[in-house]
UniProtKB/Swiss-Prot annotation:
Source organism of this protein record: Brucella canis (strain ATCC 23365 / NCTC 10854 / RM-666)
Protein known as: Xanthine-guanine phosphoribosyltransferase
Residues binding 5-phospho-alpha-D-ribose 1-diphosphate: R41, G42, D98, D99, L100, T101, D102, T103, G104, K105, T106
Main location as per UniProt: membrane
Listed GO biological process terms: GMP salvage; purine ribonucleoside salvage; XMP salvage
Length: 165
């Protein structure tokens, strides 16, 4: 798979810093949180970091598949819903976490389930941003973010194209 024109590769260190920055922003809201719902799979890593930083013990997941081939969004499928106890009070006191909001389609489905929950993502694109309450970094809609769990180390060709100087 080749990189698109606008690629945003994120290292583990950068992602950890950004997820902690998201936790700082949420902590600044000075609210009591009863649980976190991680949108799988991308929300699992930031949810773990945010839970640790905010002292939240109760973690739930919701699984909505949209990227079936890692290149374009397909039909949205809810593969696993949210437990009934967290749906009480329309999600009040719950943080919903994902790595990224792209088109906002995933967030819209979860927001229907939990309209009073607080939605937080590490990264946000313009189309999905209106559905998110707190995020850290905005990237353009045509940028593809490469997360550290999707990458490995590979040889990089020199900028000069291998010319000796």
């Amino acid at each position: 798979m080749s990189l698109p024109d606008k690629a945003f590769p994120v290292s583990w260190d950068q992602f950890h810093r950004d997820a902690r920055a998201l936790a700082w922003r949420i902590a600044g809201l000075d609210r009591e949180w009863r649980a976190i719902v991680a949108i799988t799979r991308g929300g699992l890593v930031p949810a773990a970091i945010i839970c640790r930083e905010l002292g939240i013990r109760l973690i739930e997941t919701v699984c909505i598949a949209s990227y079936h081939d890692y290149t374009s969004q397909g039909e949205m499928q809810v593969l696993k819903g949210i437990g009934a106890s967290l749906l009480e009070n329309q999600g009040e006191g719950v943080i919903v976490v994902d790595d990224l909001t792209d088109t906002g389609k995933t967030a819209a489905i979860v927001r229907e389930m939990m309209p009073r929950a607080h939605f937080a993502t590490v990264y946000a694109k313009p189309k999905g941003r209106p559905l998110i309450d707190t995020f850290v970094t905005e990237v353009s809609q045509d940028t593809w973010i490469y997360f550290p769990w999707d990458m490995g180390f590979t040889y990089q060709e020199p900028i000069a194209g291998g010319k000796r100087g």
